[in-house]
Amino acid sequence: MSEFRQMRRKRQQLSNEESIAILEKATAGTLALLGDEGYPYAVPISYVYHDGKLYFHSALAGHKVDAIRKCDKASFCVVEQDDVQPKKYTTFFRSVIAFGRIHIIEDEQEKLETARMLGNRYNPNDDESLQKEIESGFSRMLMIRFDIEYLTGKEAIELVRMRNAKSVNA
């Protein structure tokens, strides 16, 4: 058996390119770690995706940091779309889950570069303000790198059917 399960409903699986596009577009997701006493610990968090990796920032201490130091395996979920369809008792969803290894960045240069990358994701074109923000908080923050080992995306079967109908009618 491979380390990662294959999706059961293959027709609903998004391509790798579509999954990456969701990661590039979204601004937040849920990071899942192995928490205290073996309980899952899932925390909503902002991020930036770059070159097959996810980057996060954090305070120097806390539940998330303790969990990362204890176990480097993690998953990260982003829900791009979740449109409730009341009469159908379902939602039209599109989501992505990344599995991989998570690390606290120790190298100061890499930490600085990733802090800039994250800052530019949320406030582009304001380098002066970003530099001041980084300088004022750099010693009190961690930068975290999530190396994606497996990425899978899925959408509601209704969205698959709509897409197929459009391509037939095109």
Task: Give the ranges of each region predicted by the language model.
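Charged, gly/pro-rich active-site loop segments
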Residues: 2-11, 83-170
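Short, basic/aromatic recognition patches
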Residues: 2-30
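Structural motif corresponding to alpha-helix initiation and N-cap regions
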Residues: 16, 61-62
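A generic structural signal for nonpolar/aromatic side chains embedded in well-ordered alpha-helices
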Residues: 23, 67-68, 118
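Short beta-strand segments
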Residues: 26-60, 76-77
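Broad gene-expression machinery/nucleic-acid interaction feature
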Residues: 28, 42-44, 73, 93, ...
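Beta-strand-connecting loop/turn residues
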Residues: 52-53, 72, 149
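Helix-adjacent hinge/juxtasegments
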Residues: 57, 63-93
